[in-house]
């Protein structure tokens, strides 16, 4: 949908950031309407945001691990008493983070402990997606992942996302996007919003030729 159509608001309602006034949010057979963000995360959803949420002084690895707290035992007692388990969890987490990064940019795999601050925008976006993927979600929500990037960087990132999808058959990816060229290339099914309402749904070619969609984007049918 065009700017201001309600795409990000839709994501925020799904993930518990905004409360729904009416209707229900059902995920994997469970009603998660107005659930907390943590509950939604535990249910198997993960997301990225339009604006970067990375902590720039932290390393690539540390930023990715922020998304892994569902799997990690935490607390001083655990770290002090069960040091063997802590070491095992760290090694498993490191291997998982490295494997994810290698899907996007193999060169970053040997730089996991470098600060994120020195990375270009495309690599920061990659790290954000890796942080979402580290929890092994069933639903990945990407909110305008190509925002702020060049056409070349956008094409490269879309290749990465398609590779992630190909390697994770049980993973569903929903992308918020308003650039039709990106939508045409990467999507299997499109849902178009305008002023908070769904105006079209289906394959890209069907949606792109819809009179309401053309009016929403161009002002004319």
What function would you assign to each model-found segment?
Residues 1-221:
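Glycine-rich phosphate-binding loops of nucleotide-dependent enzymes
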């Amino acid at each position: 949908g065009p700017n201001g159509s309600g795409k990000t608001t839709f994501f925020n309602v799904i993930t518990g950031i905004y409360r729904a006034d009416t209707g229900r949010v059902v995920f994997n057979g469970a009603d998660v309407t107005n659930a907390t963000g943590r509950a939604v995360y535990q249910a198997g959803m993960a997301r990225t945001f339009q604006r970067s949420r990375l902590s720039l002084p932290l390393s690539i690895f540390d930023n990715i691990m922020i998304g892994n707290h569902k799997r990690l035992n935490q607390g001083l007692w655990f770290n002090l008493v069960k040091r063997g388990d802590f070491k095992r969890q760290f090694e498993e987490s490191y291997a998982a983070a490295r494997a994810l990064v290698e899907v996007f940019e193999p060169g970053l795999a040997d730089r996991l402990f470098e600060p994120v601050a020195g990375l270009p925008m495309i690599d920061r976006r990659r790290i954000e997606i890796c942080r979402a993927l580290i929890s092994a979600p069933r639903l990945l929500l990407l909110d305008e992942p190509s925002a702020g990037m060049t056409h070349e960087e956008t094409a490269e990132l879309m290749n990465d996302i398609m590779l992630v999808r190909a390697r994770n058959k049980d993973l569903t990816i929903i992308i918020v996007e308003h650039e039709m060229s990106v939508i045409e290339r990467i999507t299997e099914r499109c849902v178009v919003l305008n002023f908070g309402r769904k105006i079209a749904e289906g394959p890209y070619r069907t949606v792109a030729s819809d009179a309401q969609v053309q009016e929403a984007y161009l002002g004319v049918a």
